[in-house]
């Protein structure tokens, strides 16, 4: 499935794991209901809330040509208590 690109692991997202919040980079055209349905079906969990934002573009230079980095959308998914995604388990 092309909706979810990959999980994001930074210092902030590792802190969010303690609050049962998981962060993914997704396709820019994906909507919250699409991602919620996909996460619930694929990981067999219940989603409590989804927050999303599109980070600003960063300039990229290759010689004399100036371009921009690829755009993506970042989703922070909060799961209901008692659920977790095994991909991120600490065990």
Swiss-Prot record:
It comes from the Eukaryota. It holds the Pfam family Ribosomal_L23. GO terms for cellular component: chloroplast; cytosolic large ribosomal subunit. One of its GO terms (molecular function) is rRNA binding. One of its GO terms (biological process) is translation. The keyword Ribosomal protein applies. Its main location: plastid. Keywords: Chloroplast, Plastid, Ribonucleoprotein, Ribosomal protein, RNA-binding, rRNA-binding. Transmembrane segments: none annotated. The keyword Hydrolase does not apply. It is found in: Plastid, Chloroplast. Disulfide bonds: none annotated. Signal peptide: none annotated. Belongs to the universal ribosomal protein uL23 family. Binds to 23S rRNA. Part of the 50S ribosomal subunit. NCBIfam families: PRK05738.2-4 (NF004363). This is Large ribosomal subunit protein uL23c. It comes from Physcomitrium patens (Spreading-leaved earth moss).
């Amino acid at each position: 499935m092309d909706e979810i690109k990959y999980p994001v692991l930074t210092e902030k997202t590792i802190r969010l794991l303690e609050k049962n919040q998981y962060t993914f980079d997704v396709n820019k055209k994906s909507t919250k209901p699409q991602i919620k349905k996909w996460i619930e079906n694929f990981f067999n969990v219940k989603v409590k809330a989804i927050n999303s934002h599109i980070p600003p573009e960063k300039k990229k230079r290759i010689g004399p040509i100036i371009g921009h980095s690829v755009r993506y959308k970042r989703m922070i998914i909060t799961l209901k208590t008692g659920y977790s995604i095994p991909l991120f388990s600490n065990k």
